[in-house]
């Protein structure tokens, strides 16, 4: 078994059963006061730090990941504290996380199914702030020779979905990271099935059968490790 597929001893009580391996969901990883503090810091960041994308906007901290290596930038103390807290769980092969992507999603915004790619150590950890969301997991699309290219394909259905509440920590490793795609639908209300709740429902206070969960503004701190790091002088010389 490869190292990235190994279970995390510190998080075993929070492993999500009945879900692709390996997914850990930790409710109330931070306190309400910490959540409020982090939201203040995020929204007090200088305007040039924000990048507007279709369906969300983001801040990049720690450097810009690059195939030739990332030129590291010092994380601000308000972020470093939580990067250290996540790194202490030994998620990144015994090395510390060094990169944080801050995403803001307004109600009705989401992100298409995607994979995080080879620039990162194959583990992703996310602290959620402000609002819940539902994270959907998908099998990668396979070429279908029977469907003409010009014919639209039916919408892909997720193989499973997790309810992600504010102040939680979500960790994806193994198959959940390396093979599956994950995304967030662009909706304002998440309706929970009355007969089939998300596999992490027992850890979510709002996961009630038939619940209609109205999304607010959500901020996520996606904490990862970029293995390949360069000094600025080396990058500029290439």
Swiss-Prot record:
<dbReference type="InterPro" id="IPR027450">
    <property type="entry name" value="AlkB-like"/>
</dbReference>
<comment type="similarity">
    <text>Belongs to the alkB family.</text>
</comment>
<keyword id="KW-0408">Iron</keyword>
<dbReference type="InterPro" id="IPR032862">
    <property type="entry name" value="ALKBH6"/>
</dbReference>
<dbReference type="InterPro" id="IPR037151">
    <property type="entry name" value="AlkB-like_sf"/>
</dbReference>
<feature type="binding site">
    <location>
        <position position="105"/>
    </location>
    <ligand>
        <name>2-oxoglutarate</name>
    </ligand>
</feature>
<keyword id="KW-0223">Dioxygenase</keyword>
<feature type="binding site">
    <location>
        <position position="182"/>
    </location>
    <ligand>
        <name>Fe cation</name>
    </ligand>
</feature>
<feature type="binding site">
    <location>
        <position position="103"/>
    </location>
    <ligand>
        <name>2-oxoglutarate</name>
    </ligand>
</feature>
<feature type="binding site">
    <location>
        <position position="220"/>
    </location>
    <ligand>
        <name>2-oxoglutarate</name>
    </ligand>
</feature>
<keyword id="KW-0963">Cytoplasm</keyword>
<keyword id="KW-0560">Oxidoreductase</keyword>
<comment type="function">
    <text>Probable Fe(2+)/2-oxoglutarate-dependent dioxygenase involved in oxidative demethylation of nucleic acids. Binds nucleic acids with a preference for ssDNA or ssRNA to other types of DNAs. May play a role in nucleic acid damage repair.</text>
</comment>
<dbReference type="GO" id="GO:0051213">
    <property type="term" value="F:dioxygenase activity"/>
</dbReference>
<protein>
    <recommendedName>
        <fullName>Probable RNA/DNA demethylase ALKBH6</fullName>
        <ecNumber>1.14.11.-</ecNumber>
    </recommendedName>
</protein>
<keyword id="KW-0539">Nucleus</keyword>
<dbReference type="GO" id="GO:0005654">
    <property type="term" value="C:nucleoplasm"/>
</dbReference>
<feature type="binding site">
    <location>
        <position position="114"/>
    </location>
    <ligand>
        <name>Fe cation</name>
    </ligand>
</feature>
<keyword id="KW-0479">Metal-binding</keyword>
<feature type="binding site">
    <location>
        <position position="218"/>
    </location>
    <ligand>
        <name>2-oxoglutarate</name>
    </ligand>
</feature>
<dbReference type="Pfam" id="PF13532">
    <property type="entry name" value="2OG-FeII_Oxy_2"/>
</dbReference>
<feature type="binding site">
    <location>
        <position position="116"/>
    </location>
    <ligand>
        <name>Fe cation</name>
    </ligand>
</feature>
<dbReference type="GO" id="GO:0046872">
    <property type="term" value="F:metal ion binding"/>
</dbReference>
<dbReference type="InterPro" id="IPR005123">
    <property type="entry name" value="Oxoglu/Fe-dep_dioxygenase_dom"/>
</dbReference>
<comment type="subunit">
    <text>Interacts with VCPKMT.</text>
</comment>
<dbReference type="GO" id="GO:0005737">
    <property type="term" value="C:cytoplasm"/>
</dbReference>
<dbReference type="GO" id="GO:0005925">
    <property type="term" value="C:focal adhesion"/>
</dbReference>
<feature type="domain" description="Fe2OG dioxygenase">
    <location>
        <begin position="96"/>
        <end position="227"/>
    </location>
</feature>
């Amino acid at each position: 078994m490869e190292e990235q597929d190994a279970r995390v001893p510190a998080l075993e009580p929070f492993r999500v059963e009945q879900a692709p391996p390996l997914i850990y969901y930790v409710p109330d990883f931070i306190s309400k006061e910490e959540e409020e503090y982090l939201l203040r810091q995020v929204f007090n960041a200088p305007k040039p730090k924000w990048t507007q994308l279709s369906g969300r906007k983001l801040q990049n901290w720690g450097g810009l990941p690059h195939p030739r290596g990332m030129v590291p930038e010092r994380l601000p103390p308000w972020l470093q504290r939580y990067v250290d807290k996540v790194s202490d769980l030994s998620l990144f092969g015994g090395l510390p996380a060094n990169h944080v992507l801050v995403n803001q999603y307004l109600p009705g915004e989401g992100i298409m199914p995607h994979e995080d790619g080879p620039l990162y150590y194959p583990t992703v950890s996310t602290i959620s702030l402000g609002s819940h969301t539902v994270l959907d997991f998908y099998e990668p699309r396979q070429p279908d020779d029977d469907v003409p290219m010009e014919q639209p394909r039916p919408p892909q259905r997720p193989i499973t979905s997790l309810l992600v509440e504010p102040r939680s920590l979500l960790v994806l490793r193994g198959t959940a990271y390396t093979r599956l795609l994950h995304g967030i639908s662009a909706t304002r209300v998440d309706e929970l099935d009355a007969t089939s709740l998300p596999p992490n429902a027992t850890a979510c206070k709002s996961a009630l059968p038939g619940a209609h969960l109205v999304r607010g503004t959500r901020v996520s701190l996606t904490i990862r490790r970029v293995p390949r790091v360069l000094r600025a002088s080396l990058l500029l010389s290439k």
